[in-house]
Amino acid sequence: KETAAAKFRRQHMDSGSSSSSNSNYCNQMMKRRRMTHGRCKPVNTFVHESLADVKAVCSQKNITCKNGQPNCYQSNSTMNITDCRETGSSKYPNCAYKTSQKQKYITVACEGNPYVPVHFDGSVLLPATSTQAQAPLARGQ
């Protein structure tokens, strides 16, 4: 059976490539990575950074996951990612996706030993602050 870490790599890692010039990238990759089997996965993100860089996020900024779990981490820097989103005309088995290339901070959930990403929790343009009520000059202390 596919481990959670292997599933994360299959669904979210595409190191050393980018989708920049290819509007068909998501249609090809979603199929190739088996996310259109049985149904169309509505939204998926591919990360175009090294696996080592993405694994390193597990030791970066600890934040709460969208589902309330405490084991999410946000990257210290932006990463080159591609968002794939199902189009309105997409109908299984002919899944169709819109490809959007972005530079964003990513959030992943990590678990296991070694501690590795097992779930992609989202991406943001601006990093989360550890506490919302932080004084503006509290950085770098």
Curated annotation (Swiss-Prot):
> Where is the chain membrane-spanning?
none
> Which residues are substrate-binding?
K7, R10, K41, P42, V43, N44, T45, K66, R85
Disulfide feature: C26-C84, C40-C95, C58-C110, C65-C72
Glycoprotein as a keyword of this entry, yes or no, is yes
Active-site annotation:
H12 (proton acceptor), H119 (proton donor)
Instruction: Describe the family membership recorded for this protein in Swiss-Prot or TrEMBL.
Output: Belongs to the pancreatic ribonuclease family.
Q: What is this protein called?
A: Brain ribonuclease
User: Per the UniProt entry, what species is this protein from, by scientific name?
Assistant: Giraffa camelopardalis (Giraffe)
Gene name in the database record: BRN
